[in-house]
């Protein structure tokens, strides 16, 4: 979450009047994340999250995101719910941006997740994949294999400013993945951004998943690879196989991976590492100074990508074959 667009208190009060949400008591911006402008509101009824959708988010995608949250919650997944306006619409407008009010989810994200937490995340991810079955709206993944080269071209000219030799290395990686990317694996709705700051815990109990604004239709095992990258590496860059084992066992306790998915996991993990490297690289080079946003180091994901190149089998991630 982040803040790119400021809001005036009078405008916010007018916006709230379109909802049965009580009167405004206080509000503050939330700096974490990189996509939308987010605020924590306290009203006379309940705490809420206000999201202003910035230019990177297509307005035509919003019915998918908001409808998916409703669909998943109706099937028992703990996730935020969009609040309807008095006229029944889920979307309004504030400060020249599409805007929505979302229910507040209790919990905090973990700064130092342990293996037991990774197991819970794996289980919750599989539950989301199962619950997403039957959701009728579709959204292709613009940040998967077909979109990476276009994204790379936006940063390629300056890439060697971040690390010498990057241009050559990433061109080669794109060529490899274009040839090796698996086809025909089980697909469905994926979260596509299930990082620690998008999973809330109360103590050791997972209390919910948040931030569905990258959700889309893609390979389910690709979502698993995103979580391996996001949860199972230590701050020194080392892969923690104990966490990986817990993550994969948790996932398979709900939805067992097929043999084809298991065989593809090293390539999928290279791809998901490249995806986050590319978006971080672009943001690193283009985010304006002074924006109330946390920029993330692209080289973290370059190191993960290099790790995955050395992997020969999913057993090296901790998966029992």
Swiss-Prot record:
It catalyses: L-homoserine + ATP = O-phospho-L-homoserine + ADP + H(+). Disulfide bonds: none annotated. InterPro entries: Aminoglycoside_PTrfase, Homoserine_kinase_II, Kinase-like_dom_sf, Pseudomonas-type_ThrB. GO terms for molecular function: ATP binding; homoserine kinase activity. Pfam families: APH (PF01636). GO terms for biological process: threonine biosynthetic process. Its EC number is 2.7.1.39. Keywords: Amino-acid biosynthesis, ATP-binding, Kinase, Nucleotide-binding, Threonine biosynthesis, Transferase. Pathway: Amino-acid biosynthesis; L-threonine biosynthesis; L-threonine from L-aspartate: step 4/5. It is an enzyme of class 2 (transferase). It comes from the Bacteria. The keyword Transcription does not apply. CDD domains: HomoserineK_II. Belongs to the pseudomonas-type ThrB family. PANTHER family: AMINOGLYCOSIDE PHOSPHOTRANSFERASE DOMAIN-CONTAINING PROTEIN (PTHR21064:SF6), AMINOGLYCOSIDE PHOSPHOTRANSFERASE DOMAIN-CONTAINING PROTEIN-RELATED (PTHR21064). HAMAP family: Homoser_kinase_2. This is Homoserine kinase. It comes from Rhizobium etli (strain CIAT 652).
